[in-house]
Amino acid sequence: MRIDLCALERNLGKLKYFMPKSRGYIALVSADAFGYGVEAAAVRLMLSGADAFAVTNVSEGARVREVGSGWEIVVMSSSLPGEEDEYFENSLTPVLVSCEEIARFEKKAEELGATLAVHMRLPTVGETVPSPEEAKKMLDALLESKRLKLEAFCLLGTGTGAPQEGAKPDADFVEYAKMKTDSLGAKIFVHHSDVCDVSALPFDRALRAGLVLFGMKPSENSILKGFEPEHVLTFRSSVSQIKNLPKGATVGYGRTYTLKKDSRVALLSVGYGDGVPRNASEKMDVIIRGKRATVIGRVSMDQAAIDVSDFDEIEVGDEAIIVGESGGISIPIEEYAGRLGITPAQALTSITKRVARFYKMLY
């Protein structure tokens, strides 16, 4: 994998110009920054103007904290009992979803004689965690707490493939929260994904930017529709063998594919052990010498076969682009994932650690 950190930096800069003025930009770097490598990505984003970071759990948060202090790191998933110490040790910000969580963090803060910035999940229509009733109790408790400092509400999306990607905030709770925070003079903001419509929320806002920073185009439902990020990733392999095979020969792991004519077949040094799905036969192309070639036969752990019958020139060692651009031809991650029937995030996070990451760091 080649990862262009310069393009990552430019994507954040372009995003700031694209969006209207907001409170800030929270870089979502879950799952090892979607497989790009969280340490390298976080350092570059810190240097490029990211205001804060969002991760899935405390382990991810600790990795980001190791590479930089001074940035807020928001842990999006609810905490587990016993994890409270790690939040205080690494200055992580929990997103609280229950009164029980508040009690745990309040107790730990009292033991340590410390304070902790916290966020609270905003209740939404159709979701039950937290319910609007519990959310009101949570808000009251946090606004009264001397140890836990409520900074923000967290508005989640519902995920790709849902009937409505952007969750709708519970209007009754929003009205209650506005009344309570105004009466106390509390300055609370809302952070949200790019598929959430927050235009009616009476709070300052911050955008959680994830895949779009790493080169993925926003969905049709996104508030970033029309934004064109630069590609950050090149996923590549190389040709390891080339053979001329007769009609009727079988190809691929388990010999599941039968050639319909005399063919020239090449093997690539990549397989499901690297993150290429086992069922990629006739669903996946690669680019070699400026031409596309299609995967045929079941992918094994270490190899994949491609049909190169129409190639005039091809040699062992030739580069094969799986995701990226070569010779004026491009296979974006959206195409790669779409043809395989998976999401771009799933495709990226499936690329295993066996695949070395090489970073372009300088312009």
Q: What is each residue range found by the language model?
A:
Residues V75, L150, V239, V295-I296:
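A structural signal for short, hydrophobic beta-strand segments that form beta-sheets
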Residues P246-Y363:
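C-terminal accessory subdomain/extension
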Residues A54, V74, V95-L96, C154, ...:
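Conserved beta-strand positions in the central sheet of alpha/beta enzyme cores
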Residues N90-E127:
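A generic, well-ordered mixed alpha/beta core segment in the N-terminal half of proteins
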Residues M1-T93, T115, K149, R357-Y363:
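A charged N-terminal "starter" segment
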Residues L8, S30, V64, M120, ...:
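Conserved, mostly hydrophobic/aromatic
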Residues L5, E9-K16, A42, G61-A62, ...:
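Generic structural signal for well-ordered alpha-helices
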